[in-house]
């Protein structure tokens, strides 16, 4: 591109972006949705475990549509319930096991717009750009598609695609579809959308398309009253503006929360120690972030954001599904910063911020979800339906040898949100998210409990009501404790996925801050399968590996069905603020790339692991000294 035109383009974009404009989401009537009254048949005071996905895209998202995905939100909910749906490959696809809850969270930006371009009679059908996108001339169609992508990357939208009336119609349909699939006690569907703040690094235009720093959030509505229109990144790319809009919605009776995801590809901005504009943190900023973002999504198709080997060099299990490719730039994606991009480091930095402000902006719970752009959750390694239409349409395409294949192979088949709630309703699951009694898995349905107490004298795992007693005697994951000159006692219970692999070990991951303001971390193996013992250095041998790469199988000859224990911190200091969370590892199982290779009768790729240890991570329990 000629540099003169490049600079001119950036200059014009800056002027346009600086212009004040009425937000598309302003002055729109609220939408009334279904509210459940009374208890469902599955109600339990000691809470049930539900697995779901709060991040699924359909053909109503611009990027999914451009990848030839035509699945609708209605079909996506049917897929989550266990019904087959059409796939871009021409085949039908189906989950091995249905989910308990789900949210279709299509991008607010251009929501449904590309779908409307294909509908004769729609106002967008005869638009010049729509005609170019529909063109049978492949070059013309690709050029038009690039224009759309560029408009989003630079946050310079086409006015035809942000028409308030069109958006209102599409969003109302989205909410109505979620309502139609809501079956209290059986399946919960949430009205939701994705706020897609992708901050373009325009200097990259000199060498190619811009890359973007991912600051995306999924906005989940409890139900009852729902906003009349979503607040999109076209309204603002600044999370603080999103939070302000959310506060205004609450003033009108709307209950909603935001869930950040993919900190790993934020280029260090998701958990930065300053604001979006580069200013220092303030007490108001911290309080507002805490109020609006009680949980973060930490594992999905674009990898995990829990830990990175560069930030946790002593953690032998940190190098798991690491994905650091930027958004944009096609297949020439740059690798991104790790500082400010991973949860464990954020948890530690949060302790330091708490020392100064008395509040911690990173005191959030964690979940997994998929971010599937195929209209259905993709969490089963042996049943990979791909992540985004033509980008990875089938096994042959996913294992291709070019740069695009390399990037695709680094993606994951993951993850799930696990929620402890009294019943399968919007109200109960939403409240679990707010109190952070939730956890993340990379896909398996591992059952994980984590409690803290001063005294477990009445709790015994042999008592079938031990979980009820645990709530009576202690507090669950997501809580904060403050008492004690001695370590609190932690209750940990992990049970394998009934259809999955045995368990290797359960670990407590601790972070703390000392009196000099230095943060630290340590990992404790606290329960493990039989046949091993810890050495004098405190190291536990690996569990072994039964994976047969030639036929993509494994056996449960090693590992444990369940791991249960009580544990107290041997290094506890009552003066130090700290956090504790659980990581449960399965025994090794074949990765999706191995299943793909075996299905094709080709060599297993050597640029990714042939087997992985799937896992679950609990939300933390925080300890704060009383003073």
Show the residue positions of the predicted features.
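Cap/lid and interdomain-hinge subdomains that line or gate substrate/regulatory clefts
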Residues: 162-171, 210-214, 220, 234-259
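The substrate-binding groove and active-site-proximal loops of carbohydrate-active enzymes
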Residues: 62-67, 155-168, 222-236, 332-341
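C-terminal functional module detector
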Residues: 20-73, 77, 84-126, 133-134, ...
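Conserved, charged catalytic cores of large soluble enzymes
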Residues: 225, 235-240, 318-321
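Residue-level signal for mature regions of secreted extracellular proteins and peptides
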Residues: 12-13, 611
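C-terminal motif of bacterial Sec signal peptides marking the signal peptidase cleavage site
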Residues: 16-18
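Bacterial N-terminal signal peptides that target proteins for export
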Residues: 1-8
